[in-house]
């Protein structure tokens, strides 16, 4: 039996050429954190934490003493030990995102020690590839928003993506004008999702949903603040577009509350934010028990991409309709050198389809030169 002998964090930092924003966050830099867990036998596992990198790193650094000497195969025991230790002030938010990075790294080790991809250890690979949609269409500084976004989504269409997610939540009238122009540009067959990043109140969200429905929208993501499940329910019941959310709900209890409130039609756990693979599996099972679709949120480096692909491979076919709806993969197309640079072999789409790695663990190798190149310097 091998035991955990070391835990390290790697904060990556990159200044963007052009700043961009969603309705809730402005970006002039990309920062992400990787978690490296090493065993006595030399096996190394990699994870990633969703959210503010320096804060996640500080929490992981506080947690690491509870990992040293533990069996890396005991993922459930480690998860519960960390959660119970910090639960009084850490039931959601960055405490859970920090645990997520650790958990993903431990599952990577587990897969390597057992010579199996993580998806097999989660119960099996229901698919070997997954269609991808492009996430982008943020509002950028110094350009005309509508013409800029239309040109962007046409690039994605030409690359073979089957769908695009548009960022809204700024001004309802302008947002609707954007949706109209994008639909006119891409034609009737390309899927369009809209994401308000909780930029509206419920009254605005209902109005936008009703008006946008004529443009054949797949889902309306984060229409209102994540704390307001009653407002989610109001938006879901008073406009026709399926409602999605979940990237800001952490651990099983937050997801349980949203599912039981019938707040969403589509739940979007992020494997690097919800609590890692250990918690992701629980959320998928509970969502499917309640007839809620699962479409994971993805935002990060190549490690996050690899983890999400393993998670998606193991999502069972939803039994709530005759022809199961397949999950789709969110592929961030904004400026992000870490998406590929941290991996020795890149994970890239081919005409809008992602192949799921089948090597042990996450199925990736880390490029340590890139970790040094993009190392955060406070």
What are these regions (language model features)?
Residues 336-378:
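C-terminal extensions of enzymes
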């Amino acid at each position: 039996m091998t035991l955990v002998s070391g835990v390290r964090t790697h904060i990556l930092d990159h200044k963007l050429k052009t700043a961009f924003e969603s309705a809730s966050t402005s970006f002039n830099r990309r920062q992400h954190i990787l978690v490296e867990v090493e065993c006595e036998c030399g096996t190394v596992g990699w994870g990633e934490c969703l959210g503010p990198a320096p804060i996640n790193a500080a929490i992981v650094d506080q947690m690491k003493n509870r990992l040293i000497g533990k069996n890396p195969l005991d993922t459930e025991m480690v998860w519960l030990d960390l959660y119970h230790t910090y639960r009084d002030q850490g039931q959601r938010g960055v405490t859970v995102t920090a645990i997520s990075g650790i958990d993903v790294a431990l599952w990577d080790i587990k897969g390597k020690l057992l010579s199996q991809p993580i998806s097999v250890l989660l119960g099996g690979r229901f698919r070997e590839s997954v269609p991808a949609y492009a996430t982008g269409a943020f509002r950028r500084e110094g350009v005309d928003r509508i013409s800029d976004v239309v040109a962007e989504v046409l690039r994605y269409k030409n690359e073979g993506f089957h769908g695009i997610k548009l960022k809204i939540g700024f001004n309802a009238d302008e947002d609707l004008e954007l949706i109209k122009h994008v639909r006119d540009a891409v034609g009737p067959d390309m899927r369009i999702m809209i994401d308000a990043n909780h930029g509206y109140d419920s009254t605005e969200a209902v109005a936008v949903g009703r008006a946008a429905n004529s443009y054949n929208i797949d889902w309306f993501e984060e229409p209102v603040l994540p704390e307001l499940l009653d407002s989610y329910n109001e938006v879901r019941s008073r406009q026709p577009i399926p409602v999605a959310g979940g990237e800001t709900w952490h651990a099983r209890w937050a997801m349980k509350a949203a599912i039981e409130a019938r707040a969403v039609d589509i739940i979007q756990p992020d494997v690097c934010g919800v609590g890692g693979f250990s918690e992701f599996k629980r959320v998928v099972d509970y969502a499917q028990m309640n007839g809620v679709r699962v479409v994971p949120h993805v935002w990060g480096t190549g490690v996050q991409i690899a983890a999400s692909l393993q998670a998606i491979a193991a999502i069972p076919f939803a039994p709530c309709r005759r022809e199961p709806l397949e999950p789709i993969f969110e592929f961030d197309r904004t400026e992000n050198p870490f998406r590929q640079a941290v991996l020795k072999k890149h994970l890239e789409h081919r005409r809008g389809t992602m192949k799921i790695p089948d090597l042990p663990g996450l199925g990736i190798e880390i490029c340590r030169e890139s970790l040094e190149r993009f190392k955060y310097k406070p």
